[in-house]
Amino acid sequence: MARSATTADVFNAIGDANRRDILDSLIAGEKPVGAIVSDLRLSQPQVSKHLRVLSEVGLVRSRAEGRLRLYRLEVAHLQPFHDWLAKYEQAMNARLDRVDDYLRKLQHEGGPQ
């Protein structure tokens, strides 16, 4: 069954390049919106819109500090994506292992005839 694409979906949220850039920006640590705007060279309303989506799926958390709103990455909420991607990583590794085995066999036999 196909997944529905909603903004409450981690997969949909990280499907947007600007949102991935925001996540990349937050890897270094907590930042106010203005710093993210400077990092990405997007408008403040655009960044705020993307931060809202990322917050809705739990990838980003915010807290108030004085007049600033600081945002931080919630890495644990990337786990569903990591788990999904791990299946494909395992499949690719198994295929690469078979290629390695075949190449070793060819080398042992003296190469292709």
Feature map (PLM): residue ranges:
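Short alpha-helical segment immediately N-terminal to, or the first helix within
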Residues: 13, 24-25
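Pre-recognition alpha-helix immediately N-terminal to the DNA-recognition helix
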Residues: 20-22
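Short E/K-rich amphipathic alpha-helical oligomerization segments
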Residues: 71-75
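Conserved strand-loop elements at the edges of beta-sheets that form or border functional pockets
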Residues: 16, 62-64
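N-terminal leader segment of winged-helix/HTH proteins
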Residues: 1-17
